[in-house]
């Protein structure tokens, strides 16, 4: 049996209000519909009431106290925050880490500097004059190019490519298959062909950034492509050359940012949205899913649609578009009635 946690211990951890048996023990955490008696489960909002009513979990973290006597409840103001705190406490290391040191099959250039506490797993390549910081884990198949710098306490998952000269801060997480520092998309038409523009810049990633799986972050044409501290990027996102992403932004899956885009702090860009070349999105903005941003947005904007515009205006236009068939039919009826009236009027002259 794994480590057991009491309801009282978890209540103290999240600062909640306990309703039920403080000695109730849990050893795992599962969604309400999958949970068993030894599991903790979560109701992230009031819509989860029916799931909690029928769950077989022993303990549930809930936003309010519900009259369900079959389980112990820990009532908190922010269940999602409590879930993050509890899961980190119950599962401090959910993925097995490679041991410290350099695996015999890894290739580390003699001029590279790898901290003794770092782990360099099987088939990793670390290039000339590259640096890997303390307690950083490079999983199998990672490529670290020449003069690239990886900070301390980073997690670089399998088959990540960190091209020459890019710089990662501390506590950066890069998930499997992502490529940082590939060439930006730069070509000059010359009539019969497209001449490649050399991409001689770099990529700089701030502290506490997390990059999902299969993300591409292009190096700058000149200067740097930058993702600042605390920003979280979902899977399958493209960050173009010379983009500058602010602090603590959220960029959701399948977003595409063209070159030289600037995004302000704490902005959220939802799934499949696109931002046009050389566009600035201000701070604290919300770009809703599948939006197409074609012009600069001021701070605190909330936009949707293509081209992206104020969300309320977009909703009104969508509502109006849904009524177009009815409006067209009404116009046709009015036109026929006008024609009839014209005939009647002419007949009286």
From Swiss-Prot:
Pathway: Bacterial outer membrane biogenesis; LPS lipid A biosynthesis. Its EC number is 2.3.1.191. CDD domains: LbH_LpxD. Keywords: Acyltransferase, Lipid A biosynthesis, Lipid biosynthesis, Lipid metabolism, Repeat, Transferase. It comes from the Bacteria. The keyword Cell membrane does not apply. It catalyses: a UDP-3-O-[(3R)-3-hydroxyacyl]-alpha-D-glucosamine + a (3R)-hydroxyacyl-[ACP] = a UDP-2-N,3-O-bis[(3R)-3-hydroxyacyl]-alpha-D-glucosamine + holo-[ACP] + H(+). Transmembrane segments: none annotated. GO terms for biological process: lipid A biosynthetic process. InterPro entries: Hexapep, LpxD, Trimer_LpxA-like_sf, UDP_GlcNAc_AcTrfase_non-rep. It holds the Pfam family Hexapep. The active site is at 241 (proton acceptor). GO terms for molecular function: N-acyltransferase activity; structural constituent of carboxysome shell. GO terms for cellular component: carboxysome; membrane. Homotrimer. Belongs to the transferase hexapeptide repeat family. LpxD subfamily. Catalyzes the N-acylation of UDP-3-O-acylglucosamine using 3-hydroxyacyl-ACP as the acyl donor. Is involved in the biosynthesis of lipid A, a phosphorylated glycolipid that anchors the lipopolysaccharide to the outer membrane of the cell. This is UDP-3-O-acylglucosamine N-acyltransferase 1. The gene is lpxD1.
């Amino acid at each position: 049996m794994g480590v057991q946690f009491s309801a009282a211990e978890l209540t103290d951890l999240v600062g909640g209000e306990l309703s039920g048996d403080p000695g109730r023990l849990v050893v795992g955490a599962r969604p309400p519909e999958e949970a068993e008696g030894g599991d903790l489960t979560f109701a992230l909002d009031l819509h989860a009431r029916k799931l909690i009513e029928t769950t077989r979990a022993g303990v549930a973290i809930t936003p309010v106290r519900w009259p369900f006597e079959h389980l112990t409840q820990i009532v908190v103001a922010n269940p999602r925050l409590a879930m993050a705190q509890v899961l980190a406490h119950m599962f401090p290391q959910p993925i097995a880490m490679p041991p410290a040191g350099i695996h015999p099959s890894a290739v580390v250039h003699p001029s590279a500097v790898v901290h003794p506490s770092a782990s360099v797993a099987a088939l990793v390549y670390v290039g000339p004059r590259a640096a890997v910081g303390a307690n950083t884990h490079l999983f199998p198949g990672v490529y670290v190019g020449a003069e690239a710098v990886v900070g301390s306490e980073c997690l670089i998952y399998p088959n990540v490519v960190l091209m020459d000269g890019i710089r990662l801060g501390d506590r950066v997480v890069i998930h499997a298959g992502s490529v940082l520092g590939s060439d930006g998309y730069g070509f000059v038409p010359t009539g019969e062909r497209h001449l490649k523009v050399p991409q001689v810049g770099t990529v700089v990633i701030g502290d506490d950034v997390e990059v999902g799986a299969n993300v591409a972050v292009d190096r700058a044409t000149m200067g740097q492509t930058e993702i600042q501290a605390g920003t979280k990027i979902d899977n399958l996102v493209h960050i173009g050359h010379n983009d500058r992403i602010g602090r603590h932004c959220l960029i959701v899956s399948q977003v595409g940012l063209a070159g030289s885009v600037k995004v302000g702090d704490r902005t959220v860009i939802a799934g499949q949205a696109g931002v046009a070349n050389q566009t600035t999105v201000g701070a604290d903005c919300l770009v809703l899913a599948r939006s197409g941003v074609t012009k600069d947005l001021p701070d605190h904007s909330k936009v949707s649609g293509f081209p992206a515009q104020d969300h309320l205006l977009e909703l009104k236009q969508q509502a109006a578009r849904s009524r177009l068939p009815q409006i067209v039919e009404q116009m046709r009826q009015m036109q026929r009635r006008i024609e009839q009236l014209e005939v009647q009027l002419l007949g009286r002259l």
